Amino acid sequence: MQTVTVIIEYIQKHLSENITLAELAKEANYSISYICSAFRSVMNKTINNYIKEKRLDLAVQYLKADIPITEAAEQAGFNNYSYFYKTFKSVYGISPVEYRNRTLQENDER
């Protein structure tokens, strides 16, 4: 469990940066295969899926703050806009642009 805590803390501190499994393994002082297995057994998801979820959560916060979409993607740690767009749409069912428009519309209605 302590290994997973170390990994989660590292991810939180470096979310907007490129994070590799090798870096995480070095930070936790274990092999890549061990940290992947330990993380999956505790969190019921892969490290990469966890990172993706956290980056999407951060991107949503930026979109709600009316930060430009490409900048929101970049600040959330997505280095490739098309990957961000595809990932966002697959998780939320709408594009980042549609999400932003709905959020702004909801705010206007309040």
Regions found by a protein language model. Give the residues of each.
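Terminal helix-turn-helix DNA-binding modules in bacterial transcription factors
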Residues: 9, 13, 18, 22, ...
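Short hydrophobic/aromatic patch on the recognition helix
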Residues: 35, 39, 83-84, 88
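Short coil turns linking two alpha-helices in DNA-binding domains
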Residues: 31-32, 79-80
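Short, structured helix-loop boundary elements
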Residues: 1-4, 21
